[in-house]
Amino acid sequence: MMLIECPNCGPRNETEFSYGGQAHVAYPEDPNALSDKEWSRYLFYRENSKGIFAERWVHSGGCRKWFNALRDTATYEFKAVYRAGEPRPELNTQGGSR
């Protein structure tokens, strides 16, 4: 069992959460003006890097609020969690979390 830190409720079981994709992806200002290729890039093209990755999560089995997290995709370890709308935190060089 893995615990995920909800910024509103505290640590909870991973089964209470749902993954929401890459964080900090801006919605197009005028989606109707996009070509099919540009729209498909917005919808489907995301980073797929190994290491620290900013992600969106929702506490679907709890407060039902969205938040962002920095997670190491190689180890699954959550390095930091922060509320939606807040800037991405800087991690210190020792791998500490917020």
Swiss-Prot record:
GO biological process: tetrahydrofolate metabolic process
The UniProt record lists the keyword Cytoplasm: yes
Domain of life: Bacteria
Chief subcellular location: cytoplasm
Reactions catalysed: sarcosine + (6S)-5,6,7,8-tetrahydrofolate + O2 = (6R)-5,10-methylene-5,6,7,8-tetrahydrofolate + glycine + H2O2; sarcosine + O2 + H2O = formaldehyde + glycine + H2O2
InterPro entries xref list: SoxD, SoxD_sf
Family from the record: Belongs to the SoxD family.
Subunit structure: Heterotetramer composed of subunits alpha (SoxA), beta (SoxB), gamma (SoxG) and delta (SoxD).
Protein name: Sarcosine oxidase subunit delta
Organism: Corynebacterium sp. (strain P-1)
Gene name of the record: soxD
